[in-house]
Amino acid sequence: NKGVSILDPVLAELMTLWFTQKGFKCFDIFAGDTVFGYVTATLGNVFTGIELRQEQCDLNNKRCKDLAANYICDDALNIDTHIKDNSKDFFFTCPPYADLEVYSDLDNDLSNMEHDEFFSVYQTAMGKVYKKLKDNRFAVVVVSEVRNDKGEYISLVPKTIDIMQQSGFTYYNEIILVNAVGTLAF
């Protein structure tokens, strides 16, 4: 994985089992690897993922060719082009943690941006998610804190909560995933 973390498939499975019903239409605007799309489609849902990197999209679509999972190569900011309002049942994402892991050298890759620009783009993209979900549906955002060059938290967790609430979501729950020491990418 070239030093980039991979989403925990058990976490993807649990979130799918807890927050969806078979046949739900799920989506992710920072799709990244194949894990969530593969898991949720294997469990009987339809998945749409937006992923910035063409090579990752191609790989994901190849891995999911026999499943109801489709990855679109585009910027998360263009969510309105690909997903209609009030059309989805579940949103799941594990967005870039600012510059903690660098995914590509693309100019519009959030992992290449200074923190102020990251939060501006992140807020715009995430702010569009609420309108895509049908009423009484859930969103799961997997985030953790990131430190700046001075060792201070950049407030990714509280800013994500604020962004989601400002766009219309109710802060329903918080789940803490405890990782074993030494499992994160270096």
What is the meaning of each model-derived region?
Residues 1-186:
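Class I S-adenosyl-L-methionine-dependent methyltransferase catalytic core
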